[in-house]
Regions:
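PLP-dependent amino-acid enzyme catalytic core
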Residues: 1-362
């Protein structure tokens, strides 16, 4: 069954890498590896890598130093806080990014204000509030929360918007956030080498605004430019702005509005990061618009491993790359996708699980 699946060939602290051995034997005969971000800094998601790095870069710039001169002990010191002063970092989030910004602000002695979209659960709200941030749930979608946070930052003395998406005139901090995400990609690449794999033949990565996807795709496209992996971007079908943009021959970005209702809360973003899109449209092989059932199925696959394969706790936004890969390998109705991706007995597949059970009640 591939109901709701749409795809298009594009014409335009160390976390774990886990080998899914029996799943590999059953499917591609070679290997499927999962980069598991459920342990990152005890925050259950990769997002903190971007926000914390961008905040560090901003502080370094303001005090006239290079970030390399500010190890964590210095960056979090009272001496540097006095030199930099008091700032308020604003952001919008579906959960993980805002939690990372709040976590970093607390450790840097700064303030954080977080705006969350309509439909946000109490668990996600509480996770951010516990970090000492001012947090609210608004009656608008994610993209409108971004605009709200940006407007508030502009009106606040020493207010800074730390958002993992870019728009005209706002590009430096999103670029830093994407660079921060690069930590995860470099780890995965190194861990694959430790497992005897020079580099993956296929990379499946999820996208909301496309910042993580841009970081992942950009890394592999640059590092292995002579023989890059087949890059596949997975979106929630309710917020598939990148897929819709790829369908346009012009390559212009298409926005998706409305409530963006999906179980993949972290991917419920209807307006793409312009920086990320420049990378993705030039290097991604396939964009896929994925229904909720695909994510739910993959979450169950991770939770019920075959044989001695590791048990992985993956949230709805984290599991969809495996869901798409599994569908391409197993479903007869998706054999054209498998052929387009050239998945075969020689494939070494990397899937990214970006989060653990960030909302276990749900």
């Amino acid at each position: 069954m591939t109901e709701g699946l749409k795809w298009t060939v594009n014409h335009v602290a160390r976390s774990d890498d886990k080998h899914l051995e029996l799943m590999s034997e059953e499917n591609v005969k070679k290997s499927i590896h999962c980069k598991d971000e459920s342990y990152r800094f005890g925050l259950n998601a990769f997002k903190v890598l971007g926000g914390s790095y961008a905040m560090g870069r901003y502080i370094a710039k303001e005090v006239g130093k290079d970030i390399s001169e500010l190890p964590y002990a210095v960056l979090s010191s009272e001496e540097l806080r006095k030199e930099f002063g008091q700032a308020t970092f604003f952001t919008a989030t579906d959960g993980n990014h805002g939690r990372g910004v709040a976590w970093a602000a607390k450790r840097l002695g700064q303030k954080a204000v977080v705006r969350m979209p309509k439909g946000t659960t109490k668990t996600r709200f509480d996770n951010i509030a516990k970090e000492g941030a001012t947090v609210t749930i608004e009656e608008v979608n994610y993209d409108d929360c971004v605009r709200m946070a940006a407007a508030e930052a502009a009106k606040t003395e020493h207010g800074i918007i730390v958002q993992d998406t870019a728009w005209d005139g706002y590009e430096e901090i999103p670029s830093w956030i994407m660079q921060g995400y690069g930590t995860m990609v470099m780890e995965a690449d190194q861990q694959l080498k430790e497992a005897g794999i020079d580099h993956p033949t296929h990379v499946f990565v999820q996208a909301g605004v496309g910042s993580l996807a841009g970081a992942v795709v950009g890394y592999f496209a640059h590092k292995y430019k002579e023989n890059p992996p087949v890059m596949v971007v997975c979106e929630a079908s309710a917020a598939d702005c990148l897929y819709r943009s790829a369908m346009k021959e012009s390559g212009d970005l298409v926005n998706v509005g409305g409530d963006l209702q999906t179980i993949m809360a972290g991917l419920a973003c209807g307006e793409a990061n312009t920086i990320g899109w420049d990378i993705l449209r030039n290097h991604v092989s396939v964009f896929a618009s994925c229904p909720d059932w695909m994510s739910a199925k993959a979450t169950r696959i991770y939770a019920n491993p075959l044989g001695n394969d590791p048990h992985i706790v993956s949230g709805e936004s984290g599991s969809v790359p495996l869901g798409l890969c599994f569908t391409a390998l197993h479903d007869e109705d998706a054999k054209d996708l498998k052929e387009a991706l050239k998945l075969d007995e020689n494939s070494n597949v990397l899937v990214i699980s970006t989060e653990g059970d960030t909302d276990p009640v749900r």
